[in-house]
């Protein structure tokens, strides 16, 4: 009986200490994850604040080709205009759509044709016209109308030709960009100590 009690006590102590050690390890791991997330949150908050307030933050042009996107074009463009970044423009390139993509954009975003000296730095299918909004709410929006080039690259190149800012992001018009996507894209540029060889950055 005495031996049984001793064995039971030994097993109890073993399992108790093992459980306690496991709990300590688990708590330490969870604390590490929590601290890492909190650090990441504060770092990102600092980055966003710095980018927002710095007078040296570079402008970014978001370029998106659109071909026969009448069903979703309004929602997709509105999503792009809602991005958080201090200096950016959204360039939608209507690549010779045969539906009402152009008409819907013109009506919804109060767009009017404006004179524009198109400089073909990159060769594309012929440029037709350029639209801007009369509504201050959509002041960042530019609509380029061109002949269909057969590829998204041709439409993107037309957008690059009219871009106002030194960096650009080429994406699809139906892609949903995360709210702070431009911050993440431009961070490597402003934090790099090396001078960039090119004057433009393109990520797709």
Where would I find each of the regions flagged by the language model?
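N-terminal membrane-anchoring/stem segments of glycan-assembly enzymes
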Residues: 1-54
